[in-house]
Amino acid sequence: MTLLGTALRPAATRVMLLGAGELGKEVAIECQRLGIEVIAVDRYPDAPAMHVAHRSHVINMLDGEALRHVITEEKPHYIVPEIEAIATDTLRELEDEGLNVVPCARATQLTMNREGIRRLAAEELGLPTSTYRFADSEASFHDAVAAVGFPCIVKPVMSSSGKGQSFIRSAEQLAQAWEYAQQGGRAGAGRVIVEGVVKFDFEITLLTVSAVDGVHFCAPVGHRQQDGDYRESWQPQQMSELALKRAQEIARHVVLALGGHGLFGVELFVCGDEVIFSEVSPRPHDTGMVTLISQDLSEFALHVRAFLGMPIGAIRQYGPAASAVILPQLTSQNVTFDDVHAAVGAGVQVRLFGKPEIDGTRRLGVALATGENVEEAVIRAKKAASRVTVKG
């Protein structure tokens, strides 16, 4: 039984978002639809989810004392992390004290860095993964690369959107790759993972929901990555029945091992009928923004429904659909979007995130489109995204 209070009243149900980016914004909107009181927290002011929250706070979320202070002040019923860079030890303490962390503090802690989740998947669950080694010094990094072999990929154990990630083909790149990885970590310099390159036909995100009525799967989401970040995603990604079954088995093992209720973005490599585990996020995934147009319940609606303790029932997928990011490069604290009218149309939508500034390249929006098939949907989404002119 789920009891919900009314926002801004004494019996309000309060949700605190730790991270207030575009994904958190959609979670906030879904909470608002249920009359939930929303508090958005991020490291910078005027973040997207703050625009649709009842209150907001700006803190360093890696500072456990600051995190505990804002949670004690607001007394949320649900704490919903949207990013990895959070003082997860504090979240575990707060959960032990009776607070509800979504999906659970253990899942947040294990997935905040690539080492925790890789060791869980490969060493505890025995799932197929790429070869890997960890390193915490330049010397051990060289040893790790020698063990894995060329080509390989190096990533900070804690980073996102491709930051600090390098593809290494030869020994001449090692010094630069190490330095870049040290600059790209979300919590500063530190430990890295060196991964062998996996042969695959395509990558998918399997959006997996753990809820009171069991584990549910969205249709697989295909995506194209560039510079460590996604450019387009589409649903459904065609794959063999056997590969889909194996993907679902892997995803089920991972989310049940992590625990808690919510939506998880399980990233997998697919080569023929073979499926290899890559990563998992215990929250909505950026490639899953396509579900804003492709499903009756978006990944954000599913996440909220699951962590509130509601049953999912069934997930209806409408047919071929795609998303394409709006990714300008400029410097401005007063961004405007021109020609939006030329981007939208029948079966084509645009979402602008409302980020307060840009300094370089930054994802500021996404175009969504349907089509007769996935290829057409991708073309329509990319065309719509290209028609939006970003100015500063």
From Swiss-Prot:
Its EC number is 6.3.1.21. Coiled coil: none annotated. The lineage of its organism: Bacteria, Pseudomonadati, Pseudomonadota, Gammaproteobacteria, Enterobacterales. Belongs to the PurK/PurT family. Keywords: ATP-binding, Ligase, Magnesium, Metal-binding, Nucleotide-binding, Purine biosynthesis. Mg(2+) binds at residues 267, 279. PANTHER family: FORMATE-DEPENDENT PHOSPHORIBOSYLGLYCINAMIDE FORMYLTRANSFERASE (PTHR43055:SF1). One of its GO terms (cellular component) is cytosol. Signal peptide: none annotated. It comes from Salmonella paratyphi C (strain RKS4594). This is Formate-dependent phosphoribosylglycinamide formyltransferase. Residues 119-308 form the ATP-grasp domain. It comes from the Bacteria. The gene is purT. It catalyses: N(1)-(5-phospho-beta-D-ribosyl)glycinamide + formate + ATP = N(2)-formyl-N(1)-(5-phospho-beta-D-ribosyl)glycinamide + ADP + phosphate + H(+).
